[in-house]
Amino acid sequence: ATVQGGIXYRMP
């Protein structure tokens, strides 16, 4: 899980 540009998203 990473936070970038105020958006949290999951990465493999």
Curated annotation (Swiss-Prot):
Domain of life: Bacteria
Parts forming coiled coils: none
Record-level GO BP terms: defense response to bacterium; killing of cells of another organism; proteolysis
Enzyme superclass (EC): hydrolase
Keywords annotated in UniProt: Antibiotic, Antimicrobial, Bacteriolytic enzyme, Hydrolase, Protease, Secreted
Entry annotated with the keyword ATP-binding: no
The protein's Enzyme Commission number: 3.4.-.-
Subcellular localization, as worded in the UniProt entry: Secreted
A GO CC annotation given for this chain: extracellular region
Notes on temperature effects: Optimum temperature is 80 degrees Celsius.
Gene Ontology MF, one: peptidase activity
pH-activity relationship: Optimum pH is 7.5.
Summary of the function given for this chain in its UniProt record: Peptidase. Has bacteriolytic activity.
Known partners and oligomeric status: Monomer.
Name of the protein in question: Proteinase L5
Species annotation: Lysobacter sp. (strain XL1)
